[in-house]
């Protein structure tokens, strides 16, 4: 049996539009779910003293069939829309910039990791 390998990721989404708390849809109608939301003052992605915010988005092939269990994550500060502003920066509808830290694919899972700048 072959081990799960890393594959070249697909093209970056140009736009991600919120469809509900923790869910976004891109311009190709692909669904993205907030898989992890980190707010901390010490992050492996952040070398600043101030608080860092990173969001991990996973591309899903379809909406979950069952309602999501209670999730303590607060999505209120995430933008309603992200637009790709450059090769490594997304701009939210709130005018905040989010740096692309990672765009990868392992098996069928495509992941984006964004950090608030």
Swiss-Prot record:
It comes from the Eukaryota. One of its GO terms (molecular function) is protein serine/threonine kinase activator activity. Pfam families: TCL1_MTCP1 (PF01840). Gene3D superfamilies: TCL1/MTCP1 (2.40.15.10). InterPro entries: TCL1_MTCP1 (IPR004832), TCL1_MTCP1_sf (IPR036672). PANTHER family: PROTEIN P13 MTCP-1, T-CELL LEUKEMIA_LYMPHOMA PROTEIN 1B. Belongs to the TCL1 family. This is Protein TCL1B2. It comes from Mus musculus. The lineage of its organism: Eukaryota, Metazoa, Chordata, Craniata, Vertebrata.
